[in-house]
Structures are given as C-alpha cells and as structure tokens.
Amino acid sequence: MKRTLALIFCIFLAGCASKPSVKNLNLKSSLNYGGEELAKILEQDDAVAFSSNFREGVFIYISNAKVANYLGVVRAERHAKFSVKELGKNDFLIKSVNDLTQSFDASLERARELKCGTLVIRLKDKFQDLEAANKFLEQNESAFLKMSGEIRCK
C-alpha cells in the first residue's frame, strides 16, 4: 500500500514539474534596433516565432519548458527581450523542414554545448507567415521527441 501511494505521489510530482511555469514572455510585436525594425514577433504559450530583416528566414525561439522538453532541454533561459547579438548566438541552421532530424543530428555536438542555454532554431526555408512557423512546431512534435533522448542537461 505504501509503495502504491509513493508511486502515485511521484507521478503527481512529475506531472506538476512538467507543466510550463511561464505562460507568456510579454514580448512586443516587433523588435527595433537603432531605429530600424529588425523582426516581427508572434508570441505563443510554448514558443515565440519571428521573421527577421536582420537575417533571412523565420526564427523560432524556444521560450517555454513545454517545447524545450521536446528538445531535451531541461532548463531553457527565458528573456523578456531580444538583442541583435542574441539573434545569432545560439542557433541551429536547418536546411529544410524535411531534413530537420538529419540536420540536427549533424549538429549534435553543437546541441550538447547549448543543452542548458537559450535555444534558437533558424530555418533556411521561409514560411509564408508566422502562423505557419508555429504550425511547424506542432507538425514536427515527433521529431522533437526523438531528439529529447539524445540531448540532456548534465
């Protein structure tokens, strides 16, 4: 009986720990630097997608524990704002949506370096809009789950 109660309690704690602790980053709808608009930002509960004039493509900032856990990132840094330096500091270049897992596997050493830090995925293929970028996260959930066993914080 005690073992059963202990097991139920552990499952309860695991469920609480897996819930995202930050619902919103409260980001503005655009990022300005030096008087120039660099990015348009779409905020979601589990990620922030933004298109950028600074670099080509759509960036997806993994801001919440839910998506970070898909990638095996136990602790993801949460920022209230971006800087130009941060846009290119910790990113993975994915050649295409179809080659997501192969490209990521090729960058596994780089992924291990960033496993406990800020994580940005930079996609070469442009989305039609920011909504499509967020759909990308949902459609590739299985690929993220596959990666979660390979990238862990120590």
Annotate each language-model stretch with its function:
Residues 153-154:
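Short, solvent-exposed mixed-charge patches
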Residues 2-7:
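Sec-dependent signal peptide recognition
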Residues 14-15:
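C-terminal motif of bacterial Sec signal peptides marking the signal peptidase cleavage site
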Residues 10-11:
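Short, linear, compositionally biased motifs with a strong N-terminal bias
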